[in-house]
Design a protein with these regions (language model features):
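Positively charged n-region of N-terminal signal peptides that target proteins for export
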Residues: 1-4
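Short amphipathic alpha-helical "recognition" segments used for binding
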Residues: 6-7, 68
Length: 171
């Protein structure tokens, strides 16, 4: 009896551990998991024009160390970036399906935040779980503090700190 309970517990624990959990920092307002995953391949491109081109280029550069290649930014692609006046300035929706990743933001800044969320979802093998994320900040001002009074920070360290703040959607 004791062995069967232990075996059942071990099986449940193994099953729970094998499922990929959706962990995003900070936690979005709404996450809906779906079936399947999007795979970033050598043919994957980011579709971005105008003001959205710069956030797309930053994302492509940031994701290169994770997947081993940079994603090109073009007029057409599987990762679609758009803005909508119907959304609040920093509000976004990120929809990942097995075929496409669609990002709709209230502004280029919101699209940048959505790309930071996507950055956290990308696995080292280039897969992204199918999910719909809807988010907007709870607070207008979000930030971090760098105490430079007790320790000298080099320019590169300060830039790295700013990159970490941006990755966590702090303004």
């Amino acid at each position: 009896m004791r062995k069967s309970i232990l075996l059942i517990f071990a099986t449940l624990l193994a099953a729970a551990g094998s499922a990929r959990s959706i962990d995003i920092i900070p936690r979005p307002a709404e996450i809906t998991e779906a079936r399947g995953e999007f795979r970033i391949t050598a043919q994957t491109a980011i579709a971005a024009e105008g003001e959205l081109r710069r956030p797309a280029e930053i994302f492509a550069t940031d994701i290169e160390p994770v997947i081993g290649r940079e994603i090109p930014v073009a007029a057409k692609g599987e990762i679609l970036l758009r803005t909508s006046p119907s959304l609040a300035a920093e509000e976004y929706t990120l929809a990942v399906t097995p075929r496409t990743v669609e990002i709709l933001g209230g502004s280029p800044q919101a699209v940048f935040y959505a790309l930071q969320t996507l950055r956290q979802l990308v696995a080292t093998d280039g897969t992204v779980p199918a999910v719909v994320v809807r988010d907007k900040p709870c607070f207008a001002h979000r930030g971090g503090m760098l105490d430079s009074g007790r320790h000298f920070w080099t320019v590169d360290e300060v830039k790295r700190f700013i990159d970490i703040l941006a990755m966590h959607k702090l303004n």
